[in-house]
Amino acid sequence: MTTVSITFDLLSSMQPRKWLKNQNFVGEITSLSFDDSGELCLASCTDDTLQLYNCISGKFVKSLASKKYGAHLGRFTHHSNSLIHASTKEDNTVRYLDVVTNRYLRYFPGHKQTVTSIDVSPADETFLSASLDNTIRLWDLRSPNCQGLLNVSSPVVAAFDATGLIFASVSERKYKISLYNIKSFDARPFQDIPLTFLPPHVRIANVEFSTDGKYLLLTTGNDFHYVIDAYSGSELLRVPSKVSTKTQDGNLTYYASACMSPDSKFLFTSYDNEHLCMYQLPELKQTVNSDHIVNSFTEMGLASTTPTSNSHSTENPLAIIPSSTSKNLLPETPSIVRFNPRFSQLVTAHSGVIFWT
């Protein structure tokens, strides 16, 4: 969790303080990740490199080349000197890289098509990978062998909750979220949540839990992102997104262009190539009624009506924040938006990385 108190005034006053771009970099950034300390930011790039940045000093640290295999979905392990990433060339192997030596420590083969998501467990040395080959795999960093395999009916993305005990998968074609117990990885999901509010042919880019476990954020390659109740699957918030997708080696790359703050109270999205929008998440009040959970929603701040599961309304942003307010900063398309989980700091990216404080 963040070590600094998060408030509306603090977030709405954020400005882009530093714009960083490797002078030799000519591609685009496709994903961002932070190490456990929050001091390092990792960017995966279309020029087959992984770029490291220091979040404290706001400086470029180093570039790690992966010219043979390509790089996407780079994620730090629980050690700042190692990371894993998906391959965009050769095959669809997930690779384990030593940041200091730029040498691979281990390979995780098995996926037959493009890897769509990678998520490291917050609890231990395991991680999930999902793929267009309709599988989800569970791995242990200490072994190249797959620890668990789920065959699903359509391409999915997957993510752990904050405890590492539960993970969610979202199916594009089945329009549902499936919740699994990590201790029974190969078993059927303990809950399936239909996503009846999703429009036809929506493309899911990413799924993530809020840190308090109450919300699930679905970012898409279509016109909207969705915040849903992690217990009931009800649509709580629908916000517009106009970030384009990019075709890479014949495959579409979808950006994680929205994120929640570490206190689970605010949502940030990229909107129109020059601005970020900030929304307040609806408060979930849970009361136990017999053997099930009943959720009631209370409006907060300036939020408008909360959509029900069949609603098609959207929320108005609490604040619209320009992505460039300084003459020293070049305008950037904020196609990726991530919140540093340890500090009150936003990071956005496209062809470079912008630090907001």
Curated annotation (Swiss-Prot):
Assigned protein family: Belongs to the WD repeat SWD2 family.
Role noted for this protein: The Set1 complex specifically methylates 'Lys-4' of histone H3.
Transmembrane segments: none
Any one annotated GO CC term: Set1C/COMPASS complex
One Pfam family cited in the UniProt record for this chain: WD40
Protein name: Set1 complex component swd2
Annotated gene: swd2
Domain of life: Eukaryota
Keyword Nucleus: yes
Oligomeric and partner information: Component of the Set1 complex composed of ash2, sdc1, set1, shg1, spp1, swd1, swd2 and swd3.
Protein's organism: Schizosaccharomyces pombe (strain 972 / ATCC 24843)
Locations listed in the record: Nucleus
